[in-house]
Amino acid sequence: MKNLTWQNPEQLFVAQELINKVKSKCCGIKDKDNGAVYLSGNGPLVAVLVEALARDNQKKCKAKGEKKNKSDSEREVREFIQIIHRYRDNMLAKIKNPVENSIVEIDPEKAVKLADTGYGEVEHIAIFDEAQRSWTHKRIADYLKRGGTYGNKLKVPNFPMSEAEFLIWSLDQREDWAVIICLVGGGQEINTGEAGIGEWIKAINAKFKHWHVYLSHQLTDQEYAEGHLYELLEETPSVTYSDNLHLSVGLRSFRAESYPAFINSLLSFNPNASSILAEIKRKNEYPVLLTRDIEKARRWLREMARGTQQTGILITKAASRYQPLAINVIEGDDNTVHWFLEDKTDVRSSNYLEDAVTEIQVQGLELDYACVVWDADVRCNSDHWTYHKLSIKKQWSPSSTWKPNTEWKPETNVENQKYMLNAYRVLLTRARQGLVICIPAGNSNLTPEGFPEDSTRLPEVFDGTYEYLKSLGLEEI
């Protein structure tokens, strides 16, 4: 029997089971029936999880008197927590290459068929985190055609599947049974080429009708597949609905159950945003504050954090004018690991409030208290959002020289607009216990000639968003 199950990404039992399995492995207790793997396409998340679990279990093994170095712990952790590319590459190594007639087939000369496993991997269960981020057919086909990002991996021309379809196909190679658990969140697509959860149902309908689908009624809401999932499910042969597969209470902002609804209303200009916020404030559940001064935001974060509670600054990847606020956006998985895991004595820690991370690095992770810096990439204009990206190009000046011209250009691509707004949805829901939103005041100074000192940070590019958030009832610090 083959099952495809949908669940909310904040299900704690998944993480706890993973931790328990890793602990038993690292401390020498072998479980031969262990048949699950946690998969994610989120490199920073996998890097942080692997490092955190390796550190934790190395300490626990040491406390039991067992010798275990961190590299061994990391290797054993990676048996259960994998970047999706690694799992995918293992299966790609087994297929006939090049693909002919748009049919992916196992090459018997490259793989050995086993009684239970068939040509599949050893795991019965694949837990795919943030399944809505699986790649479209075009993105994965382009990626495999050029042999990975840098052209140094296996090249597979004319690849005919989306990432979701290929993962189902991979588990379908087993001779006995398999389950794919898709952890999904609504309105979370933030990257070009993310297919959304509808792609999984399309794959089932097209080629895997013998699979059974289990999901929650809430998955047909507007924020999932833009409300079109129900239409796709009408063509699915075996569908079972269960409300047990939906987490109705947010565990990230655990002090305020209605906080995620407030953020959704804020971003969609829903008139009930003010009343939801008023109820949160009345219950004194979750502080949501507003400021135009980054130093006030830093001071508030330091005052709120107790003990080992973690603070940090968040910013979108489309933001471009944060340097005047003394903010550095870090890059690379290693730096992200240090940002999340080091304590307050380490300058690389998020708690120093000098380095920031973007929605790409923080997706799937969270802080106790956070500051979201709202730049001029997404702006409120009355009752709608406008989208902008900073453009730097050279232009001919009166002095007969080429000079750089820097300005915000409108982003007109509808798909990119969706990603840019969803980036703020991700950032605004990363704090467990409280959030401050910093909207810069901009730079109103003029040069001696009467021109703006910084035309990219004029007050008017920030003021509309500030006035909108303040009108909802956000208190200013």
Predicted regions and their residues:
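Short secondary-structure boundary/capping segments
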Residues: 52-60, 140-147, 193-204, 227-233, ...
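Flexible loop/turn segments at secondary-structure boundaries
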Residues: 2-8, 44-48, 56, 133-136, ...
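Conserved RecA-like ASCE ATPase "motif II neighborhood" in helicase/translocase motors
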Residues: 56, 68-171, 354-358
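Conserved helicase/translocase motor-coupling segment
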Residues: 190-196, 205, 216-383, 414
